[in-house]
UniProtKB/Swiss-Prot annotation:
It comes from Oryza sativa subsp. japonica. The gene is GDH3. It is found in: Mitochondrion. Keywords: Mitochondrion, NAD, NADP, Oxidoreductase, Transit peptide. The lineage of its organism: Eukaryota, Viridiplantae, Streptophyta, Embryophyta, Tracheophyta. This is Glutamate dehydrogenase 3, mitochondrial. The active site is at residue 102. Coiled coil: none annotated.
Length: 411
């Protein structure tokens, strides 16, 4: 089952629990707008290259739509649609006043020069500038994009609409970005882990962890969990996987990787089969890489007692059912990795106010939002007698449904 089908299935289950009628369900599921544009740019060698860009704006009942823009060769409308819908529920669960959107361009960033990426970003912005905006749709970085990409979007958008720093988040600090934004998703994963373990009278300190993915989310999650006393016994990325039952020295590993080293030549651990990473012995498994990595092929072999979904849709539907039967507690992506969108909201607020927060305030407010969201999910689980994933979906869908009905959009 692909991400769109799984997200839609979770939505329908939540809608049934809430007793939403079919007309309202249809209204909530169908995107507000799907945009597909052709972006042709001159390459450095003088030839022309054409790329296809997408933006799906799913729902704006609770506020401006919010979601990343990814540059990846496999960007397709179904995936973008699923991720836009997921953002609608994620922002609602986090209690930030946004709806959901997602976008992307089908390209391979590594095959384009910096100047080609800039031209592509500016052309894409020219095509969609009248459909995004501070109070309409606020993009952010995603796979294959970064703060520099957001700076180009901001600059190009401002040519049409005047200086508008709040039109994108995840910007460089010098252009209105927020302190703490770079670490926000990984920090949110750590706060979510803390909340879950506390609920089960456990703590990060003394627990063992396996982390898949050492990109922005995984590396920050690993660093912060390590700082809290968590013992990370195995990690993996696209180059392979390593383990050390006594615990990996995460600061040393991250320094090693920043200097160009690979996992396999890191001195502080032994190489392991990457296929075994997700079923390695641990208390807490934290997948922070791609979707669908936990499936019917490996779910039955998972030894972790808790799974924290740092990635989007890392657990497919069949794996979810297998893990539930095993008694594994899964903290769903729409809550666990929402730290990024929460701090994006803080950045947007700071831009609108023209007042910058210090990093301590950003982190303090993020912790408060993550704790409150977990409590709200728990309350929903209790009232609906459901697991954490369905509790989170039901919480998000309920908030969006209420906003839709209050606006009179149900017809």
């Amino acid at each position: 089952m692909n991400a769109l089908a799984a997200t839609s299935r979770n939505f329908r289950q939540a809608a049934r629990l809430l007793g939403l009628d079919s007309k309202l369900q249809k209204s909530l599921l169908i995107p507000l707008r799907e945009i597909k544009v052709e972006c042709t740019i001159p390459k450095d060698d003088g030839t022309l290259a054409t790329f296809v860009g997408f933006r799906v704006q799913h729902d704006n009942s609770r506020g401006p739509m919010k979601g990343g823009i990814r540059y990846h060769p496999e960007v397709d409308p179904d995936e973008v649609n699923a991720l836009a819908q997921l953002m609608t529920w994620k922002t609602a669960v986090a209690a930030v006043p946004y709806g959901g959107a997602k976008g992307g361009i089908g390209c391979t960033p590594g095959e384009l020069s910096r100047s080609e990426l800039e031209r592509l970003t500016r052309v894409f912005t020219q095509k969609i500038h009248d459909l995004i905006g501070i109070n309409t749709d606020v993009p952010a970085p995603d796979m294959g994009t970064n703060a520099q990409t957001m700076a180009w979007i901001l600059d190009e958008y401002s040519k049409f609409h005047g200086h508008s720093p709040a039109v994108v988040t995840g910007k460089p600090i010098d252009l209105g970005g927020s302190l703490g934004r770079d670490a926000a998703t990984g920090r949110g994963v750590m706060y979510a882990t803390e909340a879950l373990l506390t609920e089960y009278s456990e703590s990060i300190s003394g627990s063992t962890f396996v982390i898949q993915g050492l990109g922005n989310v995984g590396s920050w999650a690993a660093k912060l969990i390590h700082q809290k006393g968590g013992k990370i016994v195995a990690v993996g990325d696209v180059t392979g996987a390593i383990r050390n039952k006594s615990g990996i020295d995460i600061p040393a590993l991250l320094k090693h990787r920043s200097e160009g080293g690979s996992l396999e030549d890191f001195y502080g651990a032994e190489v392991m089969d990457a296929a075994e990473l997700l079923v390695h012995e641990c208390d807490v498994l934290v997948p922070c890489a791609l979707g669908g990595v936990l499936n019917r092929e490996n779910a039955a072999e998972v030894k972790a007692r808790f799974i924290i979904e740092g990635a989007n849709h890392p657990t497919d539907t069949e794996a979810d059912e297998i893990l539930a039967k095993k008694g594994v507690i899964v903290l769903p992506d729409i809550y666990a990795n929402s730290g990024g969108v929460v701090v994006s909201y803080f950045e947007w607020v700071q831009n609108i106010q023209g007042f910058m927060w210090d990093e301590e305030k950003v982190n303090r407010e993020l912790q408060k939002y993550m704790k409150n969201a977990f409590q709200n999910i728990k309350d929903m689980c209790k009232s609906q007698n459901c697991n954490l994933r369905m509790g989170a979906f039901t919480l998000g869908v309920n908030r969006v449904a209420k906003a839709t009905l209050l606006r009179g959009w149900e017809a």
